[in-house]
Every structure is written in C-alpha cells, then in structure tokens.
Amino acid sequence: MKAIFSLYNIVSAILLLVLLAEFSTAELNHDKNRRGANMGLYAFPRVGRSDPSLANSLRDASDAAVFDGLYGDASQEDYNEADYQKRAGLVAFPRVGRSDAELRKFAHLLALQQVLDKRTGPSASSGLWFGPRLGKRSVDAKAFSDASKGQQEFN
C-alpha cells in the first residue's frame, strides 16, 4: 500500500515538472511577439483623416463635394508606381471617439461658456488687491523706535 502511494506521489511530481517546463517555455516563446516595455513611449505618426466630411482639407462638406465633382477621384493610373512606396514607419490608427464636426463645435462652445461663466460669476475677481499690504513687514526695531521719538501726539 505504501509503495502504491509513493509511486502515485512520484508520478504526480514528474507530471507537475513536465507541465511546469512546458508552460514556462511557452511563456518564453510568447514574449517574442509582445511589444517591448517602452513601446508606449514612442509617438507613432498617425495616418488618415479624422473626419471623412473634411475631404481634401476643406472645412465645409459641401465645398468638398463640389471639389470632388470638378476633379473626380484619383485613379491608380495617375500615380507613378516608382514614386509611390509604402512607408513602413507609419502606423494607421483608427479614429476613436467623438469625431463629428457638430460635436466638436458644441464642445468648443460649451468650454467657452464655462470660461465666461467663471469670469462673470459671483466668485469672479480681477485678481488684483487694492487694499493695504498684508503680512509681516521687516522693520528694524531701532529705526522704528527712532522714528517714534520724533512723532508727537496732540490732544
């Protein structure tokens, strides 16, 4: 009975060591595909437009539509393949979040309104103090006593 129990312990220990060795090598091989520890510190140049309505760098979508109507879409024949190379250093990031022009305009107006409310609200101040100077004034004790001797009080 003791021999079976000790055989079970030996087999369990060997199985545990084999599994540990397998998973530790898998973790080492997996590290090659991960980013480095300082990858987040590099600023990647972002590629693409944030708002498709701002085609051809025009601010108004209707102007962009007129421009596209006049000039049409560029085709592959318009570009010389020798001049065109894919830049490997550029990383295409998808634009995420509120990228609508109306939302940006609303957020800008809301921020402007908050600034104006702070300037004209009840807690607004000019930031200047026109009263007497506050705080400790450095006065020489001897000079103060000499100055007080020359002053007289009139009753």
Swiss-Prot record:
One term of GO molecular function: myostimulatory hormone activity
GO annotation (BP), single: neuropeptide signaling pathway
Pfam families xref list: Periviscerokin
Signal peptide residue numbers: 1-26
Main location: secreted
Location of the protein in the cell: Secreted
Superkingdom of the organism of origin: Eukaryota
Propeptide residue interval(s): 27-33, 50-85, 99-117, 138-155
Modified residues annotated as Leucine amide in this record: 134
InterPro entries: Periviscerokinin
Presence of keyword Repeat: no
Keywords: Amidation, Cleavage on pair of basic residues, Neuropeptide, Secreted, Signal
A cellular component annotation (GO) from this entry: extracellular region
Modification Valine amide, positions: 47, 96
Known role: CAP-1 and CAP-2, but not CAP-3 are ligands for the Capa receptor. CAP-1 and CAP-2 are probably components of the signal transduction pathway that leads to Malpighian tubule fluid secretion via the second messenger nitric oxide.
Family according to the record: Belongs to the pyrokinin family.
Record's protein name: Cardio acceleratory peptide 2b
Biological source species: Drosophila pseudoobscura pseudoobscura
